[in-house]
Amino acid sequence: IRIAGNVTNPSSTQELLIYGGVDIVKVGIGGGSACSTRFVTGCGIPQFSACLENSYVAHGLQSGIKKLGLVCSDGGHKNAGDVAKALCAGADFVMLGGYFAGTEECDGEWEYEYRSIIKKDIDNYKETFDWWQPIDPGYDTDKRKNSFTYYGMSTHIAQNNYEKNIKNYRASEGTRIVVKYKGELKQVIQELLGGIRSCCCYIGSDSIKNMPRCAELCVVNTLHNNKNPTLGV
């Protein structure tokens, strides 16, 4: 299976599928949670629009009864709802990175918090103070993961770690982000799958494949997109 990208222009998707012999086209530029490409280069379009336009072109190309190519939505999926929207926009796959940052299985830069216990005996009254703090108390105690730091692959940090040197002609197109500990990966995946199942239920779709056919799209403002006006949160 050959995967190529990233693109946002439908004509590029056509070229990759017809002339490049690609099976899957990755769609999306500048939408990643740790990405600053749109600010640094001025390039990129909204992820939902990119999926909608490129999947329409990719799925329209056929060799007999077989689809010539598929689309993978890459970047900008901050929650299960974003993944569901990408699938409704025609994405066959969704690529997630920062979504899983902070899970138990992550290997990288972790910050820990330490348990501190102080017992006091005042006038025959014993009291125990038990709390967690980010500072190591200096003695043997319990510790747990508190936060995780990750960065985009186009940052100077990644270039230095994986390419061994930083190209002087390249700009950093990403940043470092610190996220709180999220628990085990399976819990995050269960929440994600549950969100997709609920979306299918709401729109009346019996499968992921039929989500684009069942979904009805509308334009909303920032308030409705980022908050819940009913609950005021």
Name each model feature, range by range.
Residues 1-8:
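Metal-dependent enolase-superfamily TIM-barrel catalytic cores that perform enediolate-based chemistry
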Residues 1, 30-49:
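Glycine-rich tight-turn/loop motif centered on a GG-T
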Residues 42-73, 78-233:
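Alpha/beta catalytic cores of nucleotide-metabolism and tRNA/nucleoside-modifying enzymes
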Residues 8-27, 77-92:
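Catalytic cores of alpha/beta
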Residues 10-11, 31-36, 100-105, 111:
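Short gly/pro/ser/thr-enriched loop/turn and capping motifs at secondary-structure boundaries
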